[in-house]
């Protein structure tokens, strides 16, 4: 049987010979990590066995290069990967550590099911509950919260979740709410944000979920992001960088002159609505370019004459108010839909 694919996506990998950083399509399997030059390639450029390997995160060996983690094999070979943002790195680290642990224990990798361990009643439909929690009018309100000089965008507190469960009559009391919230967390419907909630989720507290105003959580597809809040009042950001970050990640972008496709890291901001793109391998903070989204049109594209038939999937196009065309490619249909929706929302806000 083929090893199960646990997670896949773009990461920047440090070369083992020339020490250069390059974006790769990375696939986490039950027994190893494969990396490809392009997502469409059939054969991997390399494979890292996970048996006996150790993982280090955060890895701060490279100064300003953020969100790096290191995998050291039994042969003492170090492999360095860089994610586009904090939550992406944490997801890779969490799943990779779990895969290594499963190999050690001779178990099959499975997302943690809390239904059995917490004795959750079979009548509780966590999926339906999650959709109710996300309801724009009656659900949990997403906020921008500040703690330890960091701003947590699109999140909410642990006690707000329990308040909502009780007031919505989903549970009879706060203790029962804690049990349900822990199950939602275990099944991936809620994600921890910040040290307090992450430590609890990793088993450092009595319950994985905290009924606490200082414990922050977010919905996995909400566009959550944590950013440093500079206390220096003299720093005046460029107007286009003032907007709140609502989504980020890697996409393929077509060049305007040569029409070739390259992996770029994108950061989407609203009010003012801008989509900045960066060279993920450079590790720098200066964008290669910016797309002003106010009044733009964004649509999915089913074919493009400049793209090979085998690589035509998940394309979309942004046409700015100045009629500049940008062609982008997501990794999956779901990811394309998420980007299109987020850009449409941003394009209608602010300047």
From Swiss-Prot:
It holds the Pfam family PH. The modification N6-acetyllysine is found at residue 64. Residues 136-221 form the DEP domain. The modification Phosphoserine is found at residues 113, 117. Transmembrane segments: none annotated. Residues 4-101, 244-348 form the PH domain. GO terms for cellular component: plasma membrane. CDD domains: DEP_PLEK1, PH1_Pleckstrin_2, PH2_Pleckstrin_2. InterPro entries: DEP_dom, PH-like_dom_sf, PH_domain, Pleckstrin, PLEK_DEP, WH-like_DNA-bd_sf, WH_DNA-bd_sf. GO terms for biological process: actin cytoskeleton organization; intracellular signal transduction. PROSITE patterns: DEP, PH_DOMAIN. Keywords: Acetylation, Phosphoprotein, Repeat. Major protein kinase C substrate of platelets. This is Pleckstrin.
């Amino acid at each position: 049987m083929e090893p199960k694919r646990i997670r896949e996506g773009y990461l920047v990998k440090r070369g083992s010979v020339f020490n250069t950083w390059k974006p790769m399509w990375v696939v986490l399997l039950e027994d190893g990590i494969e990396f490809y030059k392009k997502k469409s390639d059939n054969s991997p450029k390399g494979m890292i066995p996970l048996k006996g390997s150790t993982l280090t995160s955060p890895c701060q060996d490279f100064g300003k290069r953020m969100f790096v983690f290191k995998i050291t094999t039994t042969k003492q070979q170090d492999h360095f990967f860089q994610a586009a943002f904090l939550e992406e790195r944490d997801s890779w680290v969490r799943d990779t550590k779990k895969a290594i642990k499963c190999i050690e224990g001779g178990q099959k990798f499975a997302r943690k099911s809390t239904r059995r361990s917490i004795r959750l009643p079979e009548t509780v439909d966590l999926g339906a509950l999650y959709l109710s929690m996300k309801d724009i009018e009656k659900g949990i309100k997403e906020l921008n919260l500040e703690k330890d000089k960091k701003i947590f965008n699109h999140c909410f507190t642990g006690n707000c979740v329990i308040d909502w469960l009780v007031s919505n009559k989903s549970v009879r009391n706060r203790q029962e709410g804690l049990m349900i919230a822990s199950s939602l967390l275990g099944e991936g419907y809620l994600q921890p944000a910040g040290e307090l909630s992450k430590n609890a989720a990793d088993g450092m507290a009595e319950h994985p979920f905290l009924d606490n105003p200082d414990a922050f959580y977010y919905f996995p597809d909400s566009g959550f992001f944590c950013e440093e809040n500079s206390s220096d009042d003299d720093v005046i950001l460029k107007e286009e960088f003032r907007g709140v970050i609502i989504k980020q990640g890697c996409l393929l972008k077509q060049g305007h002159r040569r029409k070739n496709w390259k992996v770029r890291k994108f950061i989407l901001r609203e009010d003012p609505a801008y989509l900045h793109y960066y060279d993920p391998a450079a590790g720098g903070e200066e964008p290669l370019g910016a797309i002003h989204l106010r009044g733009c049109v964004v649509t999915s594209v089913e074919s493009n004459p400049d793209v090979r038939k085998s690589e035509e999937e998940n394309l979309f196009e942004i046409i700015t108010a100045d009629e500049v065309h940008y062609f982008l490619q997501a990794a999956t249909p779901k990811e394309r839909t998420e980007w299109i929706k987020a850009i449409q929302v941003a394009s209608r806000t602010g300047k």
